[in-house]
Design a protein with these regions (language model features):
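Non-catalytic regulatory/interaction regions at protein termini and inter-domain linkers
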Residues: 1-282
Length: 282
């Protein structure tokens, strides 16, 4: 659900064609998101949504209709929920991580669908229904245990590798800037970083390098401005937090003794909807 063709192109650039099939929908001037999505809700497995399109009315309509999907929200990391609790967030300057976070969003959604003790409302039933469909298509364990080696950092072309590292650098900067002042926003940035690090097989040494380089930048800037910089040592907690989350993801990546279906598709369908006229569709 994106407001411009340029943003659609950018998202498509970072959704590998051998793994994702984009489903482009047109949202009419007098139509809401729920009205557009409902007739084709079985055609896609995840959505990429621009944050400014998810106002309170649109969100309420989607929830009432039970239209809940694994979601990546494109926009500012603000620390609040725009769509549902399992959503992930990426700013526009970090879309090089989009494919990895779509994988992570689907994994989170599958885990939610298997959670116990949830109230049986329309939205919860929709989550369970989509989770079952995803399990049939992807295998019971989903994409969480099926990292694609062709998308590992070491397998990327040099330009892609550079762009991904720069994107991760910006995400980690967002994490540090909000770590003590806005824990909710910091957590969203942390999730994006950890998801990409896991699915791209980012070496731990690279994570430490990103942290050290940023802290060094801040140290030099504070020194030039004549400010104290001793407090920067406290940001080691952010690095420990990232490492703890990565350890948990790798722990979960060890499959339990659960039989896999005989057939499971690795090709995902992602809705990249564009609320524009049909003439402007790609």
């Amino acid at each position: 659900l994106l407001s411009s063709s340029a943003l659609v192109d950018l998202c498509r650039q970072w959704l590998p064609a051998n793994r994702y099939e984009s489903v482009v929908l047109s949202v009419g001037d007098n139509e809401g998101l729920a009205t557009t999505l409902a007739p084709r809700h079985d055609d896609f497995d995840a959505v990429v949504i621009e944050q400014n399109l998810l106002d309170s009315d649109a969100r309420e309509d989607l929830l009432k209709a039970g239209l809940l999907f694994p979601a990546v929200i494109v926009g500012e990391v603000k620390g609040h929920v725009d769509y549902h609790q399992e959503e992930l967030h990426l700013p526009e300057d970090q879309l090089a991580q989009l494919g990895y976070n779509v994988d992570a969003a689907i994994s989170r959604f599958l885990r939610q669908g298997r959670a116990d003790g949830r109230q049986e409302d329309t939205a919860t039933k929709a989550v369970g229904s989509l989770s079952r469909r995803l399990q049939e298509r992807l295998g019971y364990l989903g994409v969480f245990y099926k990292r694609d080696p062709s998308r590992f950092l070491g397998s990327l072309a040099p330009d892609e590798r550079r762009e991904l590292i720069e994107s991760l650098h910006r995400t980690y900067r967002d994490l540090l800037l909000s770590y003590f002042g806005d824990p909710a926003a910091a957590n969203q940035a942390l999730e994006s970083f950890v998801n990409t690090a896991f699915f791209s097989d980012l070496p731990i040494t690279r994570t430490v390098e990103i942290h050290v380089n940023l802290i060094d930048e801040y140290w030099k800037q504070l020194r030039l401005e004549g400010h104290k910089n001793d407090f920067l040592q406290d940001y080691r907690l952010a690095l420990l937090d990232v490492m703890a989350h990565l350890c948990e993801m790798y722990r979960r990546s060890i499959p339990p003794d659960i039989p896999l279906p005989s057939e499971a598709s690795n090709r995902l369908s992602v809705a990249v909807d564009q609320p524009m006229s049909s003439e402007e569709l790609l």
